[in-house]
């Protein structure tokens, strides 16, 4: 089962970036977190990606590395990672060279998951518009396959942390072939639920819901090819 699953992963990512592909696969390099300037607390809860990898490995029978990898949008090693995560509480700022590199990476197979940890919405929307001025963030409802590809979230995006009583929303940016290049979750704070139990004192059922949705993100990416 594990061998077949990882073969599917490699094949899917190769198809996504066939023009000039991202060289890494999540099975080999794992997930990465994006470091950025602007003071937006990019580094909070460093355990969340390792915890997601552990959870995915336990339920998907995968073998993702349990690492906290950090990249900047300007780094050449960005192309080693097909899955990059960004979060924070405040301002994100990308330099022009970072915007260009990030655009190239996403067009060549990279996937960016952005989770607003309350306070980064305005700056993320501004900066991602610089990356893709010709594209829009499209709201995704529960009919989008990611919501039901592994665990059933047909009732909609779960609310993990309450900030200001707004409904949780998911948005996507797609390439010309309909491939999801960027997922942005707002007013839910999914990734806080991936933290260690002592970090936010979330009850087990809340953490499990967050990790299940994270598992859906991973499964959707590796099975869509």
Question: Which functions belong to the PLM regions below?
Answer:
Residues 28-30, 38-39, 47-48, 121-198, ...:
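An acidic, glycine-rich "communication" segment
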Residues 21-83, 89-90, 181, 189-190, ...:
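Aromatic-Pro/Gly-enriched surface loop or interdomain linker
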Residues 62-72, 114-117, 135-143:
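Surface-exposed patches in mature extracellular/periplasmic domains of secreted proteins
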Residues 66-73, 95-101, 166-169:
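Alpha-helical scaffolding within the catalytic cores
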Residues 31, 83-122:
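Short alpha-beta junction capping motif
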Residues 8-18:
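Bacterial N-terminal signal peptides
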Residues 1-5:
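Positively charged n-region of N-terminal signal peptides that target proteins for export
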């Amino acid at each position: 089962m594990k061998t077949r699953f990882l073969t599917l992963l490699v094949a899917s990512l190769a198809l996504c970036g066939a023009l000039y592909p991202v060289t890494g696969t999540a099975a080999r390099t794992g997930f990465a977190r994006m470091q950025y300037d602007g003071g937006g607390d990019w580094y909070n809860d460093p355990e969340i990606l390792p915890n997601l990898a552990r959870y995915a490995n336990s339920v998907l029978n995968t073998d993702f590395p349990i690492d906290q990898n950090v990249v900047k949008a300007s780094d050449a090693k960005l192309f080693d990672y097909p899955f990059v995560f960004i979060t924070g509480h405040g301002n994100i700022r990308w330099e022009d060279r970072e915007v260009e590199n990030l655009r190239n990476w996403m067009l060549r197979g990279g996937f960016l998951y952005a989770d607003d940890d309350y306070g980064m919405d305005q700056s993320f929307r501004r900066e991602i518009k610089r990356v893709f001025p010709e594209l829009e963030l499209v709201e995704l409802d529960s009919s989008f396959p990611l919501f039901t590809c592994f665990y059933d979230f047909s009732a909609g995006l779960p609310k993990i942390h309450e900030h200001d009583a707004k409904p949780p929303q998911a948005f996507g940016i797609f390439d010309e072939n309909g491939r999801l290049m960027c997922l942005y979750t707002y007013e839910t704070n999914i990734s806080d639920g991936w933290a260690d139990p002592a970090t936010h004192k979330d009850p087990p059922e809340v953490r499990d819901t967050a990790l299940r949705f994270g598992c859906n993100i991973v499964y959707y990416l590796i099975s869509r090819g």
